[in-house]
């Protein structure tokens, strides 16, 4: 083989080395970009974790509050049922008392009128009895008013129960939003891990290429051939060139 051919091989080797260096620089830039992206994602992940932990803590508090509200709601429901039953019983009793009172009053007034008519008593006795009957009626009316106030209190408790139902719905919506946010973060982490593993594998492949590249192996065989044919000067020049190229590639790989 002539010296021109050897120089062409050397130029070709330099071109290939330049191409490999360019490819290594591209891989290095891509790895650096992915590392920056991974660091950014890690920072965002830490922030998201802090936010998530805060929201989880709040959610746990809301869950406890929800359980307490549910228990309170159940107690109020039981109390409501008891009060409704008591209200029905008191309403029935009140109606019976009013009816009995009206009957007793009518009977009493009839007896008083008959007694006064028979014995000619003064009107003062009649007035006294009427005042007593009036006082009894006022007492019963006050009891009826107390029952009505109790019924109004039950209505307010029913409104409070509706408010608790609205709070329960709001808590469930917040829980669903937190679960969706957590899923998005996990997907981004998985994507960053896959990209990093792929670039690491490509880096290893590029760093091992000089030992497995077919062109480099062919040049080594030609050098051995020239050595055997006593072309010592050419052999030494090519050997130094190849060692120089391998050293540059090794340095590039070491920097990576």
Curated annotation (Swiss-Prot):
Keyword DNA-binding tagged: no
Superkingdom of origin: Eukaryota
Keywords per UniProt: Coiled coil, Cytoplasm
InterPro entries in the cross-refs: CCDC172
Subcellular localization, as worded in the UniProt entry: Cytoplasm
Coiled-coil blocks: 10-255
Main location: cytoplasm
Keyword Cytoplasm appears in the UniProt entry: yes
GO cellular component, one term: cytoplasm
Family: Belongs to the CCDC172 family.
PANTHER family: COILED-COIL DOMAIN-CONTAINING PROTEIN 172
Protein name in the entry: Coiled-coil domain-containing protein 172
Organism whose genome encodes this protein: Xenopus laevis
């Amino acid at each position: 083989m002539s010296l021109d051919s050897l120089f062409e091989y050397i130029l070709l080797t330099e071109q290939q080395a330049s191409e490999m260096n360019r490819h290594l620089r591209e891989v290095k830039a891509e790895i650096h970009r992915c590392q920056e992206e991974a660091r950014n994602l890690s920072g965002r992940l830490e922030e998201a974790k802090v936010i998530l932990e805060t929201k989880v803590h709040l959610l746990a508090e809301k869950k406890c509050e929800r359980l307490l509200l549910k228990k309170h709601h159940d107690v109020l429901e039981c109390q409501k049922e008891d009060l409704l039953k008591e209200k029905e019983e008191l309403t029935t009793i009140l109606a019976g008392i009013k009816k009995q009172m009206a009957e007793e009053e009518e009977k009493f007034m009839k007896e008083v009128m008959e007694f006064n008519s028979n014995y000619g008593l003064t009107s003062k006795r009649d007035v006294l009895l009427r005042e007593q009957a009036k006082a009894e009626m006022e007492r019963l009316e006050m009891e009826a008013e107390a029952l009505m106030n109790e019924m109004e209190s039950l209505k307010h408790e029913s409104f409070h129960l509706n408010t608790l139902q609205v709070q329960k719905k709001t808590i469930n919506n917040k829980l669903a939003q937190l679960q969706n946010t957590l899923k998005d973060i996990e997907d981004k982490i998985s994507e960053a891990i896959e990209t990093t593993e792929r670039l690491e594998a490509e880096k290893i492949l590029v760093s091992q290429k000089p030992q497995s590249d077919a062109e480099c192996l062919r040049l080594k065989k030609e050098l051995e051939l020239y050595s055997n044919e006593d072309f010592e000067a050419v052999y030494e020049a090519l050997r130094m060139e190849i060692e120089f190229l391998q050293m540059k590639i090794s340095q590039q790989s070491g920097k990576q």
